[in-house]
């Protein structure tokens, strides 16, 4: 019997489905983008935040073109469901990133949801916002597999050196 892994074959799909169909996916992304522009930091599942990230970056690129650009205005009008946020995009967010090319958002993993479905959660935010900074997760490098193996090797070497020192210190005297 041959064991095989079920491969996730996309068949040309280059984005996540995120719901019931393409229309609900677009509505979800529009609502998430509107919330991100309004609050500059939102909490969502990892998949939704990761999928929305590219659209948020592209929206800032369009915002940097200015409110006189017809295509930029059409994109802002489509993606932002609350029309009072369009001036914020062009007058607050776009000037903040004027000298920067890309990488306008930061995404951090937060603890999984507990009460519902244990979904992997994330916080996505625009960089340079007015909110207090998020604490960056501190990773204890002593707990990685490689460092644990190196620690075990060092302990074995010390144990072997101690054992060889004890055996060389004991001098056997010939019996007479």
From Swiss-Prot:
The keyword Ion transport does not apply. Keywords: Mitochondrion, Ribonucleoprotein, Ribosomal protein, Transit peptide. The keyword Membrane does not apply. GO terms for biological process: mitochondrial genome maintenance; mitochondrial translation; translation. Residues 1-8 form a transit peptide. One of its GO terms (molecular function) is protein domain specific binding. One of its GO terms (cellular component) is mitochondrion. InterPro entries: Ribosomal_bL17, Ribosomal_bL17_sf. Pfam families: Ribosomal_L17 (PF01196). SUPFAM superfamilies: Prokaryotic ribosomal protein L17 (SSF64263). It is found in: Mitochondrion. Belongs to the bacterial ribosomal protein bL17 family. NCBIfam families: L17. Component of the mitochondrial ribosome large subunit (39S) which comprises a 16S rRNA and about 50 distinct proteins. This is Large ribosomal subunit protein bL17m. The gene is Mrpl17.
